[in-house]
Amino acid sequence: MDAVTVYHGKISRETGEKLLLATGLDGSYLLRDSESVPGVYCLCVLYQGYIYTYRVSQTETGSWSAETAPGVHKRFFRKVKNLISAFQKPDQGIVTPLQYPVEKSSGRGPQAPTGRRDSDICLNAP
């Protein structure tokens, strides 16, 4: 799980919510340990000022799944990264597609698209 850049480990629900609200971007998301269920993770997503939380767990056979909206067929994935990729598409049973990862390692929130690429930025050396 540590290889997943949006995994924040054992942070509180409140800390996760603060990180997401600080972005101000619908579709911002992170993954954290569940505070109430050992061995289960929470996929937290910001949408219209609210944080939506979906439980993510691993089966005994190693597959990953997320609890989504009632009536949505439960899907299983070999890796957490595959689960996240699937939920980046619309109509997957969560409130909004995952768009802006809030990564632990960078210490920064997601960056909104600016229309510029890194290659468009030039630095002038003295």
From Swiss-Prot:
Main location: cytoplasm
The keyword Acetylation appears for this protein: yes
Entry's Gene Ontology BP terms: adaptive immune response; cell-cell signaling; cellular defense response; humoral immune response; natural killer cell activation; natural killer cell mediated cytotoxicity; negative regulation of T cell receptor signaling pathway; positive regulation of natural killer cell mediated cytotoxicity
PTM-bearing positions, type N6-acetyllysine: K89
Region (Disordered): 100-126
Phylogenetic classification of the source organism: Eukaryota, Metazoa, Chordata, Craniata, Vertebrata
Subunit structure of this chain's protein: Interacts with CD84, CD244, LY9, SLAMF1 and FYN. Interacts with NTRK1, NTRK2 and NTRK3.
Region (Interaction with FYN SH3 domain): 67-92
Keyword field: Acetylation, Adaptive immunity, Cytoplasm, Immunity, Innate immunity, SH2 domain
GO CC annotation: cytoplasm
Membrane-spanning segments: none
SMART domains hit by this protein: SH2
Effect noted on mutating T68I: No effect on interaction with FYN SH3 domain
A GO term, aspect molecular function: protein-macromolecule adaptor activity
Protein source organism: Mus musculus (Mouse)
Entry's localization field: Cytoplasm
Protein's recorded name: SH2 domain-containing protein 1A
InterPro entries assigned: SH2, SH2_dom_sf, SH2_prot_1A, SH2D1A_SH2
Pfam families, alphabetized: SH2
Residues in SH2 domain copies: 6-104
Function: Cytoplasmic adapter regulating receptors of the signaling lymphocytic activation molecule (SLAM) family such as SLAMF1, CD244, LY9, CD84, SLAMF6 and SLAMF7. In SLAM signaling seems to cooperate with SH2D1B/EAT-2. Initially it has been proposed that association with SLAMF1 prevents SLAMF1 binding to inhibitory effectors including INPP5D/SHIP1 and PTPN11/SHP-2. However, by simultaneous interactions, recruits FYN which subsequently phosphorylates and activates SLAMF1. Positively regulates CD244/2B4- and CD84-mediated natural killer (NK) cell functions.
